[in-house]
């Protein structure tokens, strides 16, 4: 079945099974690669299923994030991103982004990345996006989030390897540059909005992402 027929009420975005990237033969890998490439070229967004990430891990990640955001504000601010040398940590509601329509934003975040040791040469050289993460003192938080980061990063590399094939690029043309990625994992907590909310208060201001590939994990729960 072609991806054009695998849509539902979520804005008509294509739903693509990537099982063939993990377990298929060369022909199946090519088919999925072409489906991903076509969706990326024609729409710019697509959804995937059969990604291979344990659903229990995904649920544990949501729970870990919820436990952090439920902490008192003073506790969360101990991990404030402004205290970090490499853009890691808590981003409070009051932090305003460089978006024209983001006057009173209604979300908070926690930013992480590839967890490198504090003696990493790039970190010591002042690289502002590489280095150690800031970890809240919550039981199991580091272990769960670290595992999720590694698995979602591996999925991103797999999708990029498929796009290499679709674009006719040599194997590794993209993925060979991902050995020490600056990939960011952002845990987000959105405040539930009323239908009559003031339009100056937004969940997320209009913006574009700078990454090669953005992966968004959708949660059924409000916020």
Question: Could you describe each region identified by the protein language model?
Answer:
Residues 1-223:
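Peripheral, non-catalytic segments flanking oxidoreductase cores
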């Amino acid at each position: 079945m072609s991806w054009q027929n695998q849509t539902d009420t979520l804005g008509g975005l294509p739903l693509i099974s990537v099982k063939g990237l993990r377990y298929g033969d060369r022909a199946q890998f090519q088919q999925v690669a072409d489906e991903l490439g076509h969706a990326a070229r024609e729409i710019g967004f697509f959804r995937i299923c059969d990604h291979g990430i344990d659903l229990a891990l995904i649920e544990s990640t949501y729970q870990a994030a919820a436990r952090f955001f439920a902490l008192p504000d003073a506790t969360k601010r101990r991990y404030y991103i402004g205290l970090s040398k490499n853009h890691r940590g808590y981003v409070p509601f009051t932090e305003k982004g460089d978006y024209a329509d983001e006057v009173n934003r209604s979300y908070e975040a926690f930013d992480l990345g590839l967890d490198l040791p504090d003696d990493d040469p790039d970190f010591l050289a002042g690289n502002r996006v590489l280095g150690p993460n800031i970890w809240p003192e919550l039981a199991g938080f580091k272990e769960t989030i670290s595992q999720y980061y590694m698995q979602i990063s591996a999925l991103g590399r797999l999708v990029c390897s498929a796009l290499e094939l679709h674009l006719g690029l040599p194997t590794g043309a993209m993925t060979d540059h991902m050995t020490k990625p600056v990939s960011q994992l952002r845990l987000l907590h959105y405040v539930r909005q009323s239908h009559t909310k003031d339009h100056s208060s937004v969940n997320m201001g209009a913006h574009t992402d700078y990454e090669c590939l953005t992966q968004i994990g959708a949660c059924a729960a409000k916020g």
